[in-house]
Every structure is written in structure tokens, then in C-alpha cells.
Amino acid sequence: MKITNIQTKTLKAPLKNPFITSLRRVDALEDLVVIVECDDGTVGYGEGAPTPQITGETMGSMMATVAYIKPHLIGREIEDFDAIIKLIHSLIVKNTTAKSALEIALYDLKAKSKKLPLFRMLGGTQTKFSTDITISMSEIDKMIVDCHSAVALGYNTLKIKIGDNPQKDVERVIAIHGALDKNIKLRLDANQGWSAKQSVELLHALERQNIIAEFIEQPVAADDIEGLKYIKERVQTPLLADESIFSINDARRLLEMQAIDYVNIKLAKTAGITQALELADLSKSFGVKCMIGCMLEGPISVAAGVHVASAKADIISMLDLDAVSLLASHPMETSIDFNESKILLSDAHGLGIKYTLSTPTIN
């Protein structure tokens, strides 16, 4: 199988509700779809969401990155897979989401060439998963209503977005905790909104109310590594690093410092599947469990995340792959059953993707 062409398309889809964090507000999904074609007619599909506030990438920069890499891949054999992956990452630094979209498409092709679903090619066997759902930041009453709506849909784990106002954040969490049955698990995500000192004070305030979330995600700035360690040494609530980890070296530093309890893996940060798998292995060597998350992105890249979760099910113990459920509609059909909190993989080859010129669909 020889690569003959690489195309890019934009995917736009409305959200059910605005997605609001301490970093940004999003009203509609806009993703880049990457289509890699081979001489035997096999096609691979990848996807990535520009998230300039986190990865520094825009739609324009992602398209430019793919266009820059494209001529170096045309004519290459998929059988030279490892060399192709190494080449992609040697050609340009950073630009992690664009490279992830390319990687996903190439992994899709490789699995199709072996007539296997991607998760089985990667050594995975698990097919059934549960994800949380994100509750966007808003007024307390609205967030409580959104929590009840999510629970009614079958979610038993909610990720609460906070981080814009420290005192209000505590009030939000206390009110939400009090409004829900105690079997509902809460995850907190401040998206870098607090200082280290504030984090300790606010988490202590919650812990005095016997509110210990499943974790607090990235409470401080991405580069505040010492701040993460300061927090971990002073609170009961487990600490999960997100924006602080883009690379293996980022993770190794935090793990060696014993600065975190969990690692959040996102393909858009790890520049694709290859380093995501390596990151899971590294975390396992330190005895630290992982969560696999996603940006606000479409079914192709979310599906890739589920395949990775299956491949590393022994260390990826939590899923935050709710982006498909946040969409009001999208132009894709999927053999992967995204049924709110429940996700079920199929035995379709590769990611299981079928594409027409106008519509990317997952078959």
C-alpha cells in the first residue's frame, strides 16, 4: 500500500449547549479531517480540533502543517510505518494536533491493511467503556440543572468545570454535591484557573465539607510544576495533570517529582497515538493510573481515543471521551456505539471509517 494523496477537509457541527471553561467559550465544533489515500484504494481518516488556548494551533496552522508534511509522505509504503511516523515528528516540532490527525489516519490505514480493528492491532481486547460528561461553567442553578439532566441520561460521573472565580468555585461544588445522590462521582477541572496557594485553600474548604472529588484536574498554570507538587503534598483530593503534560519528558519530570496522582492522556497533546501509548507505558512503570481525554472534537478522533483506551486498559482506568455526546448533530455514522455514557467498540477494520466526498462517516 503506497500513499498517493493526502487531503484535508473541515468539519463543522453544532453543540447542544455552549461549552464554557475558564479558558474559553465554544458554540460550535470546527475540526480538521485528514484523508490519506493509498494506491490500492484504501483510505485512512484522522481528525483534530484546533485549540489555540491549549496547543497554540489554529485551523490555518493545522492545514499548513499537514500541507508541509504531505510531500514527504507521498510515495511512501504503509509497510514502512515506523519510519513514516518517525519522519512526521522529525519534520516539524510542536503542532501536536495536526500531527495527531495525520497519525490517526495512518494508524487507520495500517489496521485496515491487516484487516483488524485498530484496538486489536494494538493488543487490546476490551470493547465496553464508560465515560464521564462535562458540565460547563455557568451560574450555580444552571449547573445543577445540567447535572440532573446528565444523571437522567445515565451518567454517574460528572466533570465539573470551574476556575473563573475561586470563591464561587467552592460554592458551585458544594451546591452541586448537595443536590446530587451520593453515588454520583464528581471530577473537578479548573483549567489552570487557580494559584497553588488558592488550590490548597479551596480544596481544604471542600474537604472540610467531606467533599473529596475523584480528582482535581490542572488547577494551576501548565508550567507551574512546583505548584502541582505543592498542592499534592497538602491535600487529600487526588491531582490529575492535563495541560502540564504534552510529552514523555513532561510526564517523566512530574512522575519523578511525585507531583501528581494521575496523568491525562490526550492525542491532541501527545501528537498522536504513538506517544500516547508510550505515555501510558511510562505511567505504568511509576504505578500511576491514567485518564484518556479529548478536546472538543468529532467522532473520528474520539474513536481513536477509545481504541487507545482498549490497548492500554490495564493503566487507563478513566475515560473523559464525551465530545460526541456534546454535539447536537454531526455528519457521521459509527459502528462504535456512542450511547451517552456507554461506548462500545466494534470489529470493523481500522477505526471503521467510510467516507464520501461531502461527508465523513464512520461505518
Where are these regions (language model features)?
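Structured beta-strand/loop patches that form or line metal/cofactor-binding pockets in enzymes
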Residues: 1-40, 44, 49-53, 326-329
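Conserved, mostly hydrophobic/aromatic
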Residues: 3, 34, 41, 69, ...
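Flexible C-terminal active-site loop/helix
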Residues: 4-15, 29, 295-363
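Metal- or metallocofactor-binding catalytic centers and their adjacent structured scaffolds
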Residues: 5, 37-113
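Glycine-rich phosphate/pyrophosphate-binding beta-alpha loops
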Residues: 48-56, 134-138, 291-294
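N-terminal small/glycine-rich loop or linker at the start of catalytic domains
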Residues: 112-137, 233
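Active-site mouth loops of central-metabolism enzymes
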Residues: 128-142, 162-163, 190-196, 240
